[in-house]
């Protein structure tokens, strides 16, 4: 049984064409929200429009690492729907390579999408969200609590997102706006398949068993419940919670366990 919390609310989601972003879009439209989403893949956005024909869905092709694309997305959302109640910064990209092998512009690309995309969209939507006493959400990662080997740039980008949102939350404490970040833990999505290698190209495969992970749909349901409850943070999956807990209380042991988890026979 769905609540009416999201009914008629305007929700802007970055990266809504697949994975967690698409699951959020699907669920929100089902619950009566008006949804705007952007992504880089025009074909997937077109499929999304077909799937939700007749529903209040606004889509736009945009690369969130580009400020003007973010401006066009946020401005057009307000033009179409009149306001933004909730902004979900979901667009993200990962990487997998040892830092010593890495070309530095790979990290710049990851920071551009994960951190600056969140920064740009939040700044552009902020006045409307404050006016509506709404919510700003960042889809972060366990890598934002604990640096992960082979994912130095990804970890840096998610630590940056968490720090930025924590500072913003404190600034907005008396404004009626809720600021939350979500760490999905290990959730089945395309982020690992599309993770950049040391040269900045997509890996094309996941090093993990995606079938054993939480589904994007289950993750989206948890996120929406947390938005409704106006939570500060949401850490999902047992592995995710355990990693955060261990890193806080036993950081030295966490180093060893994390290394063992990510390295097999000395290889990433």
Predicted regions and their residues:
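Residue(s) in the substrate-gating loop at a strand-loop-helix junction
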Residues: 141
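Conserved glycine-rich Rossmann-like NAD(P)H-binding loop of the short-chain dehydrogenase/reductase
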Residues: 31-48
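Substrate-binding pocket helix/loop in short-chain dehydrogenase/reductase
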Residues: 98-99, 103-109
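Active-site helix of classical SDR
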Residues: 122, 157
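Conserved glycine-rich cofactor-binding loop
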Residues: 10, 17-18
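The beta1-alpha1 cofactor-binding region of Rossmann-like NAD(H)/NADP(H)-dependent oxidoreductases
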Residues: 61-72, 104
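SDR active-site lid
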Residues: 174-238
């Amino acid at each position: 049984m769905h609540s009416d919390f999201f009914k008629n609310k305007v929700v802007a989601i970055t990266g809504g064409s697949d994975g967690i972003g698409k699951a959020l879009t699907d669920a929100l439209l089902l619950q009566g929200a008006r949804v705007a989403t952007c992504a880089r893949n025009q074909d997937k956005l077109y499929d999304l429009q077909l799937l939700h024909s007749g529903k209040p869905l606004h889509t736009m092709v945009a690369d969130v690492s580009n400020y003007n694309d973010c401006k066009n997305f946020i401005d057009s959302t307000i033009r179409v729907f009149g306001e933004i109640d909730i902004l979900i910064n979901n667009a993200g990209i990962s990487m997998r390579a040892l830092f010593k092998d890495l070309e530095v512009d790979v990290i710049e690309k990851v920071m551009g999408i994960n951190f600056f995309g969140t920064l740009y969209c939040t700044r552009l939507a902020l006045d409307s969200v404050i006016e509506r006493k709404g919510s700003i959400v960042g889809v972060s990662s366990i890598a934002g609590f604990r640096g992960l080997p082979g994912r130095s740039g990804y970890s840096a980008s998610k630590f940056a997102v968490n720090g930025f949102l924590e500072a913003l939350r404190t600034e907005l404490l008396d404004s009626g706006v809720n600021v939350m970040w979500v760490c999905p833990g290990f959730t089945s999505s395309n982020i690992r398949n599309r993770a950049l290698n040391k040269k900045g190209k997509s890996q094309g495969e996941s090093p993990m068993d995606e079938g054993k992970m939480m589904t994007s749909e289950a993750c989206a349901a948890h996120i929406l419940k947390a938005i409704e409850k106006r939570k500060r943070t949401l850490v999902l999956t047992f592995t995710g919670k355990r990693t955060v807990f261990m890193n806080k209380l036993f950081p030295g042991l966490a180093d060893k366990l994390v290394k063992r988890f990510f390295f097999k026979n000395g290889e990433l």
